């Protein structure tokens, strides 16, 4: 109480620590001279031109693997809406709102991206819930792009990582992410990150291309149990194990959610 007599004694701010690890991945390619001579194509040039896309898929796979592990942590059970355990296993018009409110409560507006299977996207289209926002990308040539949104959230449609099982038994996972869900930092101090080598002896000549990338890709609000990681870089399996993560901050600070559902008759 600011009554002119009571001391305003500072209170120390307390908190916890997050532990993360650098994830390092590598890939090498090779092509025989014979292949180039036979086809007239240059496979190594093609590979070099596509290496950014290759690693883009690598990191996408790592991120989704971490997300599914984190959302299986018991302390984050409210962040998962599993419709497959109920009588109505399909999504409805209000499913998104139920999921984000259960996960973040009064901070539910913090989830702005949905990653879903094409079958689930189809169900939302049948409910006429899909809108499209137009954006102008400035560059050498101005280009207008259109991005889908559902309930004000941007949508990424991919059949990778978003379904298990098949047919009527298929379970679809729709992920919701908010800004700051992951902490990320690239490793930029590699020596010889991309290296070429030519072996003139083997198979009458082989071109080799060695690559490696490293990145911190950490779920914000949790800590990775580094004592459970066998080597200096965690494996895909280690990052995908929910027991290797522990909650460090309030659950509302974890900007992730998950909806598990099947495909049925959409209800509005």
Describe these PLM feature segments:
Residues 1-25:
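Assembly/oligomerization interface modules of large self-assembling protein complexes
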Residues 34-106, 243-245, 252, 261, ...:
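Alpha-helical scaffold segments that mediate packing/assembly in large oligomeric complexes
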Residues 51, 118-120, 213:
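Short, flexible loop/turn elements at secondary-structure junctions
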Residues 1, 60-64, 215-223:
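Intrinsically disordered or highly flexible coil/loop and linker segments, enriched in small
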Residues 26, 35, 57, 120-122, ...:
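Short loop/turn segments at secondary-structure transitions that flank enzyme active sites
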Residues 84-94, 125-268:
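Sequence/fold signature of self-assembling virion shell proteins
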Residues 24-27, 50, 207-209:
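Oligomerization/assembly interface segments of phage tail-like spikes and tubes
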Residues 23-39, 43, 96-126:
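Structured, hydrophobic secondary-structure cores that serve as assembly/anchoring elements
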């Amino acid at each position: 109480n600011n009554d002119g007599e009571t001391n305003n004694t500072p209170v120390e701010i307390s908190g916890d620590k997050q532990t993360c690890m650098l994830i390092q991945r590598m890939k090498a390619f090779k092509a025989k001279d014979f292949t180039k001579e036979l086809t007239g194509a240059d496979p190594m040039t093609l590979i070099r031109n596509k290496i950014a896309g290759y690693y883009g898929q690598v990191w996408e796979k790592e991120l989704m693997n971490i997300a599914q592990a984190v959302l299986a942590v018991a302390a984050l059970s409210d962040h998962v809406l599993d419709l497959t355990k109920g009588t109505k296993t399909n999504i409805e018009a209000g499913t998104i709102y139920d999921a984000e409110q259960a996960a973040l409560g009064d901070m539910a507006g913090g989830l702005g991206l949905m990653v879903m299977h094409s079958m689930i996207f189809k169900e939302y289209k049948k409910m006429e819930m899909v809108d499209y926002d137009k954006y102008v990308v400035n560059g050498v040539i101005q280009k207008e792009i259109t991005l889908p949104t559902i309930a004000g959230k941007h949508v990424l449609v991919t059949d990778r990582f978003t379904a298990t099982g098949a047919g009527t038994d298929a379970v679809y996972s729709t992920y919701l992410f908010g800004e700051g869900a992951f902490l990320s930092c690239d490793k930029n101090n590699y020596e010889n990150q991309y290296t070429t080598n030519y072996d003139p002896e083997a198979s009458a000549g082989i071109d080799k291309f060695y690559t490696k990338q490293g990145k911190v890709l950490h779920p914000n609000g949790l800590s990775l149990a580094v004592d459970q990681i066998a080597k200096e870089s965690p494996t895909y399996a280690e990052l995908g194990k929910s027991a290797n993560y522990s909650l460090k901050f309030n659950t509302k600070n974890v900007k992730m959610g998950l909806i598990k559902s099947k495909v049925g008759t959409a209800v509005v």
